[in-house]
């Protein structure tokens, strides 16, 4: 179910404070965050976020196309190494 329009997008307060501080200071340093649930809003355009994926921080540069998505959508948490298959099948192809 989608979020109600009258509520507006969800952004953690501590992330928004860091965004405002970075915009006011014209700071290009990445903003380190564990808040994967925060929605990307227009104030974040041009900033780089280091989003935690459970193991390390993934740099995410925010552009206009990212608005409305969550920060966590750009930092995958699972690695797919392929389905297990026998060596003979791979050699035969």
Curated annotation (Swiss-Prot):
GO terms for cellular component: cytoplasm; small ribosomal subunit. Coiled coil: none annotated. This is Small ribosomal subunit protein uS19. Keywords: Ribonucleoprotein, Ribosomal protein, RNA-binding, rRNA-binding. It comes from Campylobacter concisus (strain 13826). GO terms for biological process: ribosomal small subunit assembly; translation. Protein S19 forms a complex with S13 that binds strongly to the 16S ribosomal RNA. One of its GO terms (molecular function) is rRNA binding. SUPFAM superfamilies: Ribosomal protein S19. Pfam families: Ribosomal_S19. Gene3D superfamilies: 30s Ribosomal Protein S19, Chain A. The gene is rpsS. Belongs to the universal ribosomal protein uS19 family. PROSITE patterns: RIBOSOMAL_S19 (PS00323). InterPro entries: Ribosomal_uS19, Ribosomal_uS19_bac-type, Ribosomal_uS19_CS, Ribosomal_uS19_SF.
């Amino acid at each position: 179910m989608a979020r109600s329009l009258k509520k507006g997008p969800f952004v953690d307060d501590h992330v928004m404070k860091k965004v405002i501080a970075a915009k006011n200071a014209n700071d290009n340093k990445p903003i380190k965050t564990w808040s994967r649930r925060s929605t990307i809003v227009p104030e974040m355009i041009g900033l780089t976020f280091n989003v935690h994926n459970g193991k390390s921080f993934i740099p995410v540069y925010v552009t206009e196309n990212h608005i409305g998505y969550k920060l966590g959508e750009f930092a995958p948490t699972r690695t797919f190494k392929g389905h297990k298959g026998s060596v003979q099948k791979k050699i035969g192809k």
